[in-house]
């Protein structure tokens, strides 16, 4: 995805046409009724379930294309669809339909001494560009979220998920048509030429309002470096768990294994475990044992190696590595102060968790750690819009402008001010 490709006149013309169609669709979509949007979403979910066999067949072709390649297991996992994941995809769309419509919501209202009545009201962003790699479910999640928020969306999938994404996209368009909404409200770029990505990053002649990348570090870095429009993104999910001396050991064991091993290839998977130095005798060995029993490779600091000398030594690079695999770095730290210092040094500001029963420790963690998502006594794998009750997410944002954390329906809106007067003039 990082390759720099000279723009092709044909690709530029194609992409600019897609941009014009998206912008034209965004206007009526911005004031479409909640009923129409929900009708479209439920029809999309129905179409996905009705076409499950076709989607799975197309996904099998995508998977066959990468057979024999040196592809990471985490990549294959993200690309793979099955009955359960398709059902979850459809259910996610229905959950988005069930959410309150953010468009037109009055966020704040106040009266001025001169009698002016001011309201801040949610509005759609306009046209969202979503560039993603191996996750075909993004076609459904992003399309549904953007629609609910009154936005048009241009989806550019990776070549690896092309067939799967196309099969899902057909279902999304079917839902739009069923509700009488513009079919160009959700478009999938029909070519795999990387010049299409460059065209989107340039904004398609002003059509795109925001870009959201979903993929590996190289893709996100390219988008952040080259985009001429605002970007909602995270570069990587370097997530930490700190186990305090006050932590309930059985709870800590359960959470640590889940945070690392439930799905190792997602951005909310834990990559570093920090154990309070005061808990070396009570917590460290049991935590190492449950991770090893779960099939996780441990890369250990010098202090950890003194307790478990058979482990692999962690290098400096390990502390800043997003493994996306069954590997975790483990270190001991000097209490909550040491944990915060380590996280500040190596974190990607995505998600961090503290396991502790001491409320003072939890309060310091929540106050001083500056990541988008902080958890207490819960797995980092809850870093997900669906788990937050957002129905789904278009991604996780770690920046501090506009959207941070899971980017759901509300985060895909802007706002405007409505000011009502009764003939006031400014003195």
UniProtKB/Swiss-Prot annotation:
CDD domains: ALDH_F18-19_ProA-GPR (cd07079). Keywords: Amino-acid biosynthesis, Cytoplasm, NADP, Oxidoreductase, Proline biosynthesis. The gene is proA. The keyword RNA-binding does not apply. This is Gamma-glutamyl phosphate reductase. InterPro entries: Ald_DH/histidinol_DH, Ald_DH_C, Ald_DH_N, Aldehyde_DH_dom, G-glutamylP_reductase_CS, Glu-5-SA_DH, GPR_dom. The keyword Metal-binding does not apply. Catalyzes the NADPH-dependent reduction of L-glutamate 5-phosphate into L-glutamate 5-semialdehyde and phosphate. The product spontaneously undergoes cyclization to form 1-pyrroline-5-carboxylate. It is an enzyme of class 1 (oxidoreductase).
């Amino acid at each position: 995805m990082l390759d720099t490709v000279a723009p092709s006149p044909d690709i530029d013309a194609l992409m600019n046409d897609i941009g014009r169609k998206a912008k034209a669709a965004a206007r009526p979509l911005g004031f479409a009724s909640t009923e129409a949007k929900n009708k479209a979403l439920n029809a999309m979910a129905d179409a996905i379930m009705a076409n499950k066999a076709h989607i799975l067949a197309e996904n099998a072709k995508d998977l066959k294309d990468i057979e024999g390649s040196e592809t990471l297991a985490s990549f294959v996992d993200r690309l793979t669809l099955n009955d359960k994941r398709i059902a979850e995809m459809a259910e996610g769309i229905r959950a988005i339909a069930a959410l309150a419509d953010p468009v037109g919501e009055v966020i704040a209202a106040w009266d001025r001494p001169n009698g002016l009545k001011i309201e801040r009201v949610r509005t759609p962003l306009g046209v969202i560009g979503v560039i993603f790699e191996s996750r075909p479910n993004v076609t459904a999640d992003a399309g549904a979220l953007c629609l609910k928020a009154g936005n048009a969306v241009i989806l550019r999938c990776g070549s690896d998920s092309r067939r799967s994404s196309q099969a899902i996209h057909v279902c999304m368009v079917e839902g739009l048509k069923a509700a009488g909404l513009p079919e160009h409200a959700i478009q999938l770029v029909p070519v795999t030429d990387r010049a299409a990505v460059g065209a989107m990053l340039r904004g398609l002649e002003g059509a795109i309002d925001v870009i959201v990348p979903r993929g590996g570090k190289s893709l996100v870095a390219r988008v952040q470096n080259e985009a001429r429009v605002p970007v909602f993104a995270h570069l990587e999910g370097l997530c930490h768990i700190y186990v305090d001396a006050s932590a309930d050991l059985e709870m800590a064991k359960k959470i640590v294994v889940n945070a690392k091993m439930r799905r190792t290839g997602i951005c909310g998977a834990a990559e570093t475990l920090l154990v309070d130095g005061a808990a070396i005798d009570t917590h460290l060995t049991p935590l190492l044992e449950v991770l090893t029993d779960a099939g996780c490779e441990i890369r250990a600091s010098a202090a950890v190696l003194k307790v478990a000398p058979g482990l692999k030594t962690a290098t400096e690079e390990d502390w800043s590595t997003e493994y996306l695999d069954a590997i975790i770095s483990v270190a001991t730290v000097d209490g909550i102060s040491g944990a915060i210092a380590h996280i500040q040094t190596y974190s990607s500001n995505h998600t961090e968790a503290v396991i502790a029963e001491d409320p003072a420790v939890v309060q310091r963690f929540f106050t001083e750690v500056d990541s988008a998502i902080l958890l207490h006594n819960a797995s980092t794998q809850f870093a997900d819009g669906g788990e937050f009750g957002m129905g789904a997410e278009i991604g996780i944002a770690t920046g501090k402008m506009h959207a941070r954390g899971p980017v759901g329906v509300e985060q895909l809106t802007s706002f405007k001010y409505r000011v009502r007067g009764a003939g006031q003039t400014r003195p």
